């Protein structure tokens, strides 16, 4: 391509760039700027993200109230209702079903240990020991899986022993 055709292709783009660079900037930020920037500001509550205001379809209805983060935390802590069936995302799973299954159907000595650790998970959570509850939950899960694995190995060994016994018997 020659130099004149490149300039013809760039011509529609160049005036808008030069006009934007030469135009005086107003003090008020425009809504929907082509390249929005992200800024952070330090406040007494820590670092906060400052976002440019977004255009709204309900511009004539007034500014919506933004809830204060501290107010929502204090109102949540004052209520005794935990929201029904919703569980806290921090509550570790106790793996009680796996522990019961491993006691009843698999290798019961290890399953009993998994069952005890599953109960320790809930007791530690009730006392407020989040780390202890998480550790007990992980150990209960590992012992439950170990009990299932040992139970499967025991059942497989029993089937192999039974097959060997039946194969060695003389036919009637």
From Swiss-Prot:
List, alphabetically, the Pfam families matched.
CD225
Which InterPro entries does the UniProt entry name for this protein? CD225/Dispanin_fam (IPR007593)
Location(s) in or outside the cell: Membrane
**Which residues are exposed on the Cytoplasmic face of the membrane?**
119-139
One GO cellular component this record assigns the protein to is: membrane
Answer whether the UniProt record assigns the keyword Cell inner membrane to this protein. Answer: no
Key words, A-Z? Membrane, Transmembrane, Transmembrane helix
Topology versus the membrane? Multi-pass membrane protein
Tell me yes or no: is Transmembrane helix among this UniProt entry's keywords.
yes
Domain of life (superkingdom): Eukaryota
PANTHER family, per this entry? Answer: TRANSMEMBRANE PROTEIN 91 (PTHR14768:SF2), UPF0338 PROTEIN (PTHR14768)
Q: What is this protein called?
A: Transmembrane protein 91
